[in-house]
Amino acid sequence: MSDKIQESYRQSRNIYDDVLTRSTWWSRLYMDIFWGGVDDNETARKVISYIPDDFSGKLLDVPVGTGVFTAAKYAVMDGAEITCLDYSVDMLDQARERFRKEEISNCRLVQGDVGALPFDDASFDIVLTMNGFHAFPDKEKAYSEVNRVLKPGGTLAGCFCIRGESRRTDWLMTRILSRKGWFTPPFETFESLKARLERGYRLDEYHKEGSIVYFKATKR
């Protein structure tokens, strides 16, 4: 990945959670105007609900971000072995501090590139990928690596931004967010992602809210 991505997320570290969680008036206004009022909190809850509270296997969270949506879930997953990877050192620092405050001890944080995951083949029972694929610069490598480290019969669950649902959102993604380094084209459409996933997975859940797709799939 590029230094531009590192720098873009370093610059946004103080507003990242506010935007995702709609916790300020300006973040709610931004989400309403440019994202059609989509509530990332609700989407995240749906995705995280695909993971059983009593899960006791190995889970990879990539990118972990700040852990704002996952910390509460991980706090009750005592039997799980969780690996949290992100390219951004700033995101990892925030996640580490959040997990420390929540006394979450079953998460290992790793700085790394989703396009070259430092794990063996078929290492994980679940791969969770929230708000990442619209930012990953080499999406083909990312898809390949996620598939490689997931066990056959394992679960891929996630959500991210897609194009083709709103002209206003598409403009924001290509003209603003991509230029800032927060997003990286090309972007999937609802149908292109479905076709891609169906080549290697059974789609158990596949939905969209505005320009956000969320899903649960089982690797064949």
Each language-model region and where it sits:
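A short SAM/SAH-binding and catalytic strip from SAM-dependent methyltransferases
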Residues: 126-138
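A short glycine-rich, Lys/Arg-flanked "PGG" loop and its adjoining helix->strand segment in the class I
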Residues: 140-152
